């Protein structure tokens, strides 16, 4: 089933926020510039509060400076970001998120100037929503741009005595599994979960399994593991522990694997030796090596590498 693009969803939400904030800021700025006294729209009552700001006797005797500042800081900026996103320019999502932070900083000045009020509070929340949408769009774009093509690894399967087993939601573990199989000539076997793991709902569902350290149902293991001299198991880390589908695989494979090493892929800068020790217990083996790799949106950094041991 074709998955809905999370990037496009976040991008549309961010376009809404940039247009909403941008158009509102332009409207407010025009009211200030057309009537700097603020009397027409009842904004003259705000001027006494501006006197706590630096250079108030010069720039805050009327609303002219405030109008220009609002137009530039929250109006034109957000409309520019919206235009870039409508033109499908990646810079638009980055700027849209940044301008959400700008709005929050703007409102922080209002918190300093004015008594606690509904408008300042709600627009601060709007800024949080805009910044969050911008960050989500940036992350989802990088995730969806990440691809792994098996055809790029021509030596997979050259050595019939080795096997690489992996589970991967986003493709990050798959890439490392293919690289290892291409390096050693191993065949590959993918663990497939019987639960939903794709997309945002899949992320939260997997997090539930990870938090409780439950086993996740997987498709039957239809490969003769004992036929391989050496098996490499590649696993993501879920909530600081072994991924649930890999845990289920290890239980199903107990006593069938003669020799194993592990590759762990995760977001944090850690080694996660606890996951390797858990796989050892479940499989009834002692791993010959462990590689622990930090991955953030497709950028890898090895956090530990153990040389193979003779056992």
Across the structure, where does each feature detected by a protein language model lie?
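Topology signature of small-to-medium multi-pass alpha-helical membrane proteins
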Residues: 2-156, 251-252, 281
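Early exported N-terminus immediately downstream of N-terminal targeting peptides
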Residues: 29-30, 36, 186-199
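N-terminal beta-loop-helix "entrance" segment that forms/cooperates
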Residues: 43-49, 55, 194-213
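Intrinsic-disorder/low-complexity, polar/charged segments
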Residues: 89, 117, 198-200, 305-306
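FMN-binding flavodoxin-like domain, especially the glycine-rich phosphate-binding loop
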Residues: 129-163, 168-192, 205-311
